[in-house]
UniProtKB/Swiss-Prot annotation:
Its EC number is 2.3.1.15. Its main location: membrane. This is Glycerol-3-phosphate acyltransferase. Belongs to the GPAT/DAPAT family. Coiled coil: none annotated. One of its GO terms (biological process) is fatty acid metabolic process. It comes from Shewanella sp. (strain MR-4). One of its GO terms (molecular function) is glycerol-3-phosphate O-acyltransferase activity. Keywords: Acyltransferase, Cell inner membrane, Cell membrane, Lipid biosynthesis, Lipid metabolism, Membrane, Phospholipid biosynthesis, Phospholipid metabolism, Transferase. It is found in: Cell inner membrane. The HXXXXD motif is essential for acyltransferase activity and may constitute the binding site for the phosphate moiety of the glycerol-3-phosphate.
Amino acid sequence: MPKQDSLWLKSLRWIQKHLVHTIVVPQDPFADLNLDASRPLAYVMKTESLSDIAALSEITTKLGLPSPYEPLVVNGVVAPRVVCLEGRKPLFGERASNEPFLECFMRLLAVHKEKPELDIQLVPVSLYWGRTPGKEDDTMKAAVLERENPTWLRKCLMILFLGRHNFVQFSNAVSLRYMADEHGTDMGIAHKLARVARVHFRRQRKVMTGPVLPNRQAMFHSLLKSESLRKAIQEEAASKKISETQARETAIEYLDEIAANYSDSLVRIAERFLTWLWNKLYSGINIKGAEQIRQLHHDGHEIVYVPCHRSHMDYLLLSYILYYQGMVPPHIAAGINLNFWPAGPLFRRGGAFFIRRSFNGNKLYTAVFREYLDQLFAKGYSVEYFSEGGRSRTGRLLAPKTGMIAMTINSVLRGIERPVTLVPVYLGYDHVMEVATYHKELSGKKKQKESVWQVFGAIRKLGNFGQGYVNFGEPITLQNFLNETAPNWRAEVADDPEQKPTWLTPAVNVLANRVMTRINDAAAASSITLTSLVLLASEQNALERCLLERQLDLYLTLLKRVPYTSFTSVAEGDGKHLVQQGLELNKFSINADPLGEIVSIDANQAISMTYYRNNIIHLFIIPSLIASCLTNNKQISRAHILGIVSDFYPLLKAELFMGIKDLPSYVNQVLDLFIEQGLVQESDTLSVVTEHTSQMLLLAGSVSETLQRYAIIFNLLAHRPKMERSELESESHLLAQRLGALHGITAPEFYDKKLYNTLSVKLKELGYFSEKEDKSDVERIRDQANSLLRASVRQTIVASVTAEHIV
């Protein structure tokens, strides 16, 4: 390797500095890959390349990592900082032997034998000039821009045309101490290291670029030859009394309507536009858990992303983040309503495939869609769909639509060998552009049809929207899920592939709910969501600034000391910092008087802010319920609190997709924290410390509307034990409207009919609609709910339930 200060390398670095723009994956290798700055470090690269090392040198300088030009000096032994698996490819002739590079491995291993305390970190580094996967019929372009093994001439062309799309990816370090201790230090181990590294680099390239793209028309013809589609076409012809040719043409029309037409060129252009857009919209995008997903890709999993659905921005945000995290944007299942000009064709070339809201018993369309989805999985393309089926209008997760999840499981049952893994994704925003529209729709206004004018209208209103949040939840590998749910599933499917297993529908429902629960497990508690939660629990949606900051400090402590899950993310900073962030985004108002500052939510903004509160209310609903038990009882035992929480938890779990694994332990940890923080004192029983009553009342306020709903339901059930589910839903909704009008409850979800349907389904599952005479459970929970309400609210509910018109 030429010396760093040689004229040749200086000239090369100067040229590349002006032609090359490099993106680093991950952005902070020290933090994301747990590199140890105190231990020696060497780089492993696939191919020796002056331009690659020059690009790496620029990055290591910015990150504070050792320069690839600096030799590695350990225990008197001098070795190159970069170990390459193979030499440069000459313009003509054979590549040089890789023996010099194996000798580097040998020298580094030998030093470990001599010095037991030494542990060199071997960090694989991959460089990519562009990320085009190529097409199945690609010839000329592949020849000119051969990316895996380019000659110096081809590399010059790549830098010239693709220099602005250079990616440098660092991987987890390999401990040479471990290799030396476990496997020895001979030449055989050096060869083994080289083989493992080659496999790693091959897989890494597949993760970064994705599989080759199909020729769309060739793919259509291939799909039409499949046995299931041939059979569906024959059945369509017979049922509609048309020729098979006509039925086949209909199938082609369906394929053309559904199928994506992924274009790497469009993705590169979109990347530049989206970089501009995010910089204009957001002050930052916070990402958690991307490394585990990269590893799943690397291990050969078929990845299906299942995000929550807050905004039309979701389609763009997740694809953009995955691209910059060194993964390929997925093929996205989009509603057919988004297939309008010019957005539809652009979305399609960005990887969207379109799905009708309802298949309406159209067997041919169903068969075409299933076969297309199977093809995506078989070819190794990652897929994304929104299991909620539409955007949440309240900020809470919607009950899942199980169609796409069922199709995914069916693809596994039909014999996909690679592990298929669902990745729940929490998407959050400090500002959702559509919130105002959502509340108009909830109040009865008809939903507007998507159009290009809506897009232009949204872009015209772009401003400072704070931060975005992308948290990857705990993955679910479907083969493991099926082994857990139906241990003999492989044998059952092999015996009768056409027969639908009896356990399939219940398994799909369980899986859908597990996905939603794991999305909520990965929630992001941000400055906006936390501050909204506090202010909306106050009487006038207003608090003294110092009290607001103190309450936020308590919530931050609670989330950090008693974490909801390890996948949840919590805002950085203290309460003071969070309040300031909210004020800078104009989400809250501040007024000063001689006694201090008051932070409030404007009356016309209160309904909108419930959306952000609802994003994270599940994180605080149990602590809030505990606080409600404490503030409504002068003395109360731990056992009594746990009993109340245990009675309400099944409903909370169904409504808010909660997944607390050990409820008694969680309740006790929260109580212990309250005691440690001086909020609660304990002798034989628990009681609130007088000077902290206001803090506990504020925390208790977050569960009040939920308890009011439960009080309505259980008062109705206790008063009319034999009422039907449909009656309970309609009369609960009617009472909620009355209660809201009398007591000023404006939260949209309080009047959401779907929510009462979800609760009634859970109540039936729990046996509350049974014919048995003993209604002590219903009466007990009714009394518990009533005891936790304000007297005026309780009186309204009881009086309304017993009134003649409701009976």
